[in-house]
Amino acid sequence: MPKLKITPMMQQYFKLKEQHPHTILFYRMGDFYEMFFEDAITASKILGITLTSRNKKSDSAQIPMCGIPYHALQGYLAKMVEAGKRVAICEQVEDPSTAQGIVKREVVQIVTPGVVTDNQLLDAKSNNFVTAISRGKNNRYGLSFLDITTGEFIVADFAGSDGEADILDQLTRLTPTELLVSEEELEDFAETIDLATTLIPGLCITPRPHHLFDFDQSHEKLLEHFAVISLDGFGCETLVEGQIAAAILLDYIEETQKSAIHHIEKLSRLELDAILQIDDSSRRNLELTQTIVGGNRSGSLLSVLDLTTTPMGARFLKQAILFPLQDRARILRRLNAVGYFFNNSEARHQIRELLDQVYDIERLNSRITLGSANGRDMLAMKQSLARLPEMLTELRKCDTDELIEIEQTLDTLEDLHQLLDKSIHPDPPTNIREGNLIREGYNAELDEIIVLLRDGKKLILDLEAKERERTGIAKLKVSYNRVFGYFIEVSRAQSSRVPEHYIRKQTLVNAERFITPELKEFETKVLGAEDRRLELEYQLFATVRNELASHSSRFLATAHQLALLDFYASAAEVSQQYNYHRPEIRDDGSLEIREGRHPVIERSLPAGKFVPNDVYLDQAENEILVITGPNMAGKSTVLRQTALIVLMAQMGYYVPADSARIGVVDRIFTRVGAMDDLRRGQSTFMVEMSETANILNNATPRSLVILDEIGRGTSTYDGLSIAWAVTEHLVQKDGIGVKTMFATHYHELTDLARRYARIQNYSIAVREWQKSVIFLHKLIKGGTSRSYGIQVAALAGVPAQVVERAHEILHSIESGDFLAGEKVGGQPQKELSEHKPHQPSLFAPPTDEIRTKIREMDLDELTPRQALDALYALKEMTV
């Protein structure tokens, strides 16, 4: 078997690969990036490119190889990142024409799912977080998130037996693309990691050396990075494990970017007590940012509310949905700003028009700071900054505190705009080594070179005309290529007419190529000027870029202000277009919604077709609403829209209702639907009970609980018993109870309203017409004992004979005949009672005597007094 011959180039490759063992190495060779061995096999499958081999024509062992053109790098990188791979970009760092021996190469960047800066690899409307978790003693955990493209850096500590559950909840909230874990704790975190990778598709797990997870060195690293003597200013000094996680991220970013990360200027503590908390299950049930089925953005609350015009505003909106506020004062400040734009349409339209011309300043800033910004990025920044003075003029007309504060603090960055305007070419290329980066008039030396090059083209034309006249060869031409430089070309037929001082350089099939001393002298002057121009333009561009990078904090501050403006103006636009109204924010624990609508469902219906509903909850007589009624009537819609209206109000948003009085809530819980959670290996009933347990253990008197069926995953009697006990617990919790809306098919639960003054019965109005049912979708006071399941089955397309048979059986059951061996529909029925497993009921079955008495009553003829007497008589019969 042939042995592998190691060339100097492959020796260099092996050395670089050894330094970056957990990456796919993109190894630059001329105009291509090449991959070898296992990297080539893996990359060829992901990228869909041909796998070939090196050393085909030698007696050495063949090396698997594939390659991509250098100019197509970003497209192929996107595929690698989407596949969860880490890619090391290895470049030639010296000119091959001047290199002595093998060309020097270095890894200049490592691209991973969580550490990317190119727009082609990013979702403009979402953050791209890389995350680290740390575990200390006594069930203490640290968690940190960093988005290198926006500079956002978040840290948190968790303690207690629920620490890993808290971490998982935050992971599913912020959905990072990469998670860093100590290589020695992968097994300890296995369950959390498995759940995280299941709940967050595409999450990449990256092990890190365990020795880095040290508090002392982590603390020092953070102090050094932020140039402070204490982290108290960030509120993070006491977060031991959180600091470790944060330092792990900084170390990782420095390792992958191979450069300083000066735009990471602030560390923010995740203050869970300051936000309206919504757990992962409730976020999914309410479809805040993506749908349950398919995980699509379209059909979510975010998709309806997003009329933002900038990427910064879109990301801020998403964070506002995921982190609603609890602080009434902050909510009111947001509402006031939205209200200004709601009431001033001209200001709103003007601000939105200006914002629409602003690019992603946050991500442009990160590329500038990291040294990867190109000419088009600089042009985009210049065009964005050009709009700021006009925006400031509009803001000076505002009379709302929140907007006045933005007006007083908005940095229009006019000095940096002037620098960009003077220095950057109005139409620069993407490749910063191609020239045409710098505007004429910015640098005197560059201007001289440009004049020489421009005149040089005229000199070429003059020389060509002169040689044609001298030789009499009409089709003589002066041309250029990279191999021979400048040359004179004549046809073979005319080659005998060339002067003697012409020096033959190349013979072609139909032409001859020559040079002259005059042409060679010109070439030396012009080509040297071209090389000097390219190098000088690159140096000037890098200098301008570095100057902008030194103002990173100013760019980020302005970007944040613009994100706020976009959020406020777009919220007002949504409210105007969709007929939303300002909610009244209170601290009294009450909830009153008049003519409320579901923000997503109403957008899918023709205008005016959605049926609005009123909801009133308090901690006195309307603490728990037990809502009965058939499927398809709209119970679930009313429940979900109530939760969404509360959430929108605490975002600082107007709400889809004619009016709303919202008492600030601390948490929203939902137990909605029933499906097996195969991701967690849990059955329908286990999912229900896990979510219910979370509610019962964590809900407070300031919470809002949404229950859409409990107990459907088990037997009827078990389910009814659990639902009854859960409702009692919620009304009695902490002696105050919890505001709850409970939709159920257990009509027996309506009896709870007689036992507890704070429980009220409601139902969804239905109208019967002949044998069909019409759903009115209106929430009305009072319970119902009808589920209309057979009518719903008919609407769903169940065959008519099955529906008719179901009616017969239902009638027989209600009359007590079905289990007594009587005939139903002419068919003898088997005695079922002796086969039915015994299960105790919460309610004693009525006796035949009571049933007979009720049947004999003519309810239409009874007076109120007679009805009351009859009711007392029936009660006596039960004693």
From Swiss-Prot:
Gene Ontology, cellular component aspect: cytosol
Gene3D superfamilies, per the entry: 1.10.1420.10, 6.10.140.430, DNA repair protein MutS, domain I, MutS, connector domain, P-loop containing nucleotide triphosphate hydrolases
A molecular function (GO) term: damaged DNA binding
Binding site for ATP: G629, P630, N631, M632, A633, G634, K635, S636
PROSITE patterns associated with the record: DNA_MISMATCH_REPAIR_2
Classification via Pfam families: MutS_I, MutS_II, MutS_III, MutS_IV, MutS_V
Alphabetical keyword list: ATP-binding, DNA damage, DNA repair, DNA-binding, Nucleotide-binding
Entry's Gene Ontology BP terms: mismatch repair
SMART domains found in the cross-reference section: MUTSac, MUTSd
Superkingdom, natural source: Bacteria
UniProt xrefs under InterPro entries: DNA_mismatch_repair_MutS, DNA_mismatch_repair_MutS-lik_N, DNA_mismatch_repair_MutS/MSH, DNA_mismatch_repair_MutS_C, DNA_mismatch_repair_MutS_clamp, DNA_mismatch_repair_MutS_core, DNA_mismatch_repair_MutS_N, DNA_mismatch_repair_MutS_sf
Region (Disordered): 824-845
Xref: HAMAP family: MutS
PANTHER family the record matches: DNA MISMATCH REPAIR PROTEIN MSH1, MITOCHONDRIAL, DNA MISMATCH REPAIR PROTEIN MUTS FAMILY MEMBER
Function: This protein is involved in the repair of mismatches in DNA. It is possible that it carries out the mismatch recognition step. This protein has a weak ATPase activity.
Family (UniProt): Belongs to the DNA mismatch repair MutS family.
Protein name, as recorded: DNA mismatch repair protein MutS
Record organism: Desulfotalea psychrophila (strain LSv54 / DSM 12343)
Biological classification of the source: Bacteria, Pseudomonadati, Thermodesulfobacteriota, Desulfobulbia, Desulfobulbales
Gene name tied to this protein: mutS
